[in-house]
A protein has these predicted regions:
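Internal intein/HINT superfamily modules and their associated LAGLIDADG
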Residues: 1-251
């Protein structure tokens, strides 16, 4: 299994997925991994399915579909792959969900009533600051591409301003690490109302950094609808008087 793909997948799950634990009627614990995307991005779910060779795609409604890895597939296919490559989730919520799953596997706990109140952290990496993430998480760039597929935006506004943004609720250290990947001229925006952080770039020199990252660096590529969005975004930049002198990838 391609480790770059797995790192990309971890980033996508951190953004648009969750590990769901439920108590069955007989008291046993069941875990499912769910990734939900817009139906226009069904191709991304199909791509992941083709790489993992496990999982099921279900239509939620007229807008969304989901890829589900059920209990056995999650525990005995995906988890061993992640552990063998030292891949861990980076957002607080997903890390907590994964810790619970790992605890039940390590201690062979099958019934809900046997779960302790406190679950240990299984990630061996400690992040006290954004530099820790950049230096210790060797798969961070592949992870970031996955998170962009989930939560990033390549946008062209009506006033012809063109930019790139990515945001998350909470996870301040993680967002600061993303900021340091590009070191843009605009500071991180924080919404007190939504408790969310946003890295947003529109300056010419910052847009060049974005192009360099997604077109010229060697990491996992964008896929699906986000790739289509990026290519359309590049076309918009080429037609813009402000941005057309940037260095672009060859067609």
């Amino acid at each position: 299994m391609d480790v770059s793909f797995l790192a990309f997948l971890v980033g996508l799950i951190d953004g648009d997925g969750y590990i769901f634990a439920r108590k069955k009627s007989n008291g046993y614990i069941e875990f499912n991994l769910v990734i939900s995307l817009h139906n226009r991005d069904l191709g991304t779910l199909e791509y992941i399915l083709s790489k993992l060779h496990c999982g099921t795609i279900n239509k939620i409604n007229a807008i969304q579909s989901k890829l589900v890895l059920y209990n056995y597939e999650l525990k005995y296919v995906l988890v061993p792959l992640l552990l063998s490559h030292g891949l861990f989730f980076l957002t607080e919520n997903r890390a907590k969900q994964y810790n619970l799953l790992l605890y039940t596997l390590e201690n062979n706990i099958k019934k809900w009533e046997l779960l302790p109140e406190v679950i240990p952290n299984y990630n061996p990496l400690v992040f006290n600051n954004p530099q820790d993430i950049l230096s210790k998480v060797w798969y961070f760039k592949d992870w970031f591409v996955g998170s962009v597929v989930a939560e990033g935006s390549f946008f062209i506004q009506a006033n012809k301003e063109i930019g790139f943004s990515v945001g998350q609720k909470g996870n301040s250290i993680l967002m600061e690490a993303i900021y340091l990947l590009f070191k843009p001229s605009r500071k991180i925006y924080y919404s007190e109302k939504n408790k969310a952080y946003l890295v947003r770039m529109t300056a010419v020199k910052d847009i060049q950094k974005v192009i360099n990252f997604f077109s010229f660096e060697n990491h996992y590529p964008l896929i699906g609808l986000k790739k289509e969005s990026y290519l359309a975004w590049l076309d918009g930049l080429k037609e813009s008087a402000r941005y057309k002198s940037l260095e672009f990838p060859k067609d």
